[in-house]
Curated annotation (Swiss-Prot):
This is Floricaula/leafy-like protein FL1. Residues 246-250, 315-322, 386-389 bind DNA. GO terms for biological process: regulation of DNA-templated transcription. InterPro entries: FLO/LFY_C (IPR035209), FLO_LFY (IPR002910), Floricaula/leafy_C_sf (IPR038276), LFY_SAM (IPR035079). It comes from Pinus radiata (Monterey pine). GO terms for cellular component: nucleus.
Length: 404
């Protein structure tokens, strides 16, 4: 090919000094001359060198020659342009280089261009995902801290209120009666109900009794209609013809505690994972008898086998949703039990407890050189489960912070 079509900066072996007039018009850079031991001024294009440097970074270690990079820069392509192009557009670019500019693209260069662009896209997507997870984790920490502060403030307020009531209201606490505190006139409050039915509508009367506004029959009927509409809406099928997704029927319970009502406890949840391990053994036995490939982890085949055997309460979304909670239960039962007791005392729902189970696992991964995959594979009960994607991403994010 004719070398006159390329910027002079690519031909670093060219030892000819640049003209003085051209050097005054264009920015220069210094290249060391090995033969004469003195610096040599080489002219660089005004707007091509910056783009070229970006292309060098993009295609570094992917086997793309400088001649190809120079021609792509001359055509006006930058690293950002290439990263935002589709596979078809990349094919058109390489076809143009071959047919229109008569360049001999090597096979490795073709795959190198595609691989470099694909890797850069994946890196950008991973970076955005890490930022999103970092924002979510920070928001979760702030929410937990805010809940702790609210709980402490509510406890202090309730303690102060109870002391004030005990001192000032002999009608409620007869043991504190004295001559200075005569029984109050109940009629002074608009409503003398002492039972709190709605904390948002509760008001304190002058002497400490809690007055709750009286609910009219119209408001009761309106609330009843609203509840009926909610129940009717929950029973209606979704837009796609399937049932609407419902919350998993679990509540936070302490170890050994039996759940009451319609929802199950966490011991029942962990027992489901034990049952999945037994169903996996049955699937492996059947596969060996048929001479088929045996699954080593809990896959869709295991869930179908469980459903076929009547275990309809075992399904893939539920088991994948809480697998990291089961991992913490297997790896550090003391920490798992502590979290269960803590969130049970706070009255938190199972969703908040589930989010809190991530952080002890990240700490365990830090102690094991961030080998979360190996931690799962070395445990007899966890090696049949896949590592959750979010747990893997959190470990990667924390590891990146330590490296920085």
């Amino acid at each position: 090919m004719d070398a006159e079509h390329f910027p002079v900066g690519f031909f670093r072996w060219d030892q000819r000094p640049a003209p003085v007039v051209a050097a005054a018009a264009a920015p220069t850079t210094t290249v060391f001359n090995k033969d004469h031991g003195r610096p040599l001024e080489v002219i660089l294009p005004m707007n091509g060198r910056k783009d070229l440097k970006s292309l060098e970074d993009l295609f570094k270690e992917y086997g793309v020659r400088y001649v190809t990079l120079a021609k792509m820069t001359e055509m006006g392509f930058t690293a950002n342009t290439l990263v935002n192009m589709t596979e078809e557009e990349i094919e058109d670019l390489m076809k143009t280089l071959v047919e229109l500019y008569h360049m001999d693209l090597l096979i490795g260069e073709r795959y190198g261009i595609k691989s470099a662009i694909r890797a850069e896209k994946k890196r950008l997507q991973d970076s955005l995902e890490m930022q999103r997870l970092e924002i979510l984790s920070e928001a979760e920490r702030k929410r937990i801290l805010h809940d702790d502060q609210n709980t402490f403030a509510a406890a202090m307020a309730s303690e102060g209120t109870s002391k004030e009531l005990r001192a000032n209201d002999p009608l409620i606490f007869p043991e504190s009666t004295s001559a200075d505190h005569a029984p109050m006139n109940i009629a002074s409050c608009k409503d003398s109900t002492l039972i709190l039915q709605n904390s948002n509508q509760a008001q304190f009367c002058g002497s400490g009794l809690i007055g709750v506004p009286e609910h009219s029959s119209e408001s009761d009927e309106r609330k009843a209609d609203t509840n009926k509409q909610k129940r009717r809406r929950s029973k209606e099928p979704g837009e796609d013809g399937e049932d609407r997704p419902r919350e998993h029927p679990f509540i936070v319970t302490e170890p050994g505690e039996l759940a009451r009502g319609k929802k199950n406890g966490l011991d029942y949840l962990f027992d489901l994972y034990e049952q999945c391990g037994k169903f996996l053994l049955e699937v492996q036995r059947i596969a060996k008898e048929k001479g088929e490939k045996c699954p080593t982890k809990v896959t869709n085949q295991v869930f179908r086998h469980a459903k076929h055997n009547g275990a309809v309460y075992i399904n893939k979304p539920k088991m994948r949703h809480y697998v990291h909670c089961y991992a913490l239960h297997c790896l550090d039962s003391e920490q798992s039990n502590h979290l269960r007791r803590l969130y049970k005392e706070r009255g938190e729902n199972v969703g908040a407890w589930r989010q809190a189970c991530y952080y002890p696992l990240v700490a365990i991964a830090r102690e094991n050189n961030w080998d979360i995959e190996g931690i799962f594979n070395r445990n007899e009960k966890l090696k049949i489960w896949y590592v959750p994607t979010k747990l893997r991403q959190l470990c990667h994010m924390e590891r990146s912070k330590e490296c920085q």
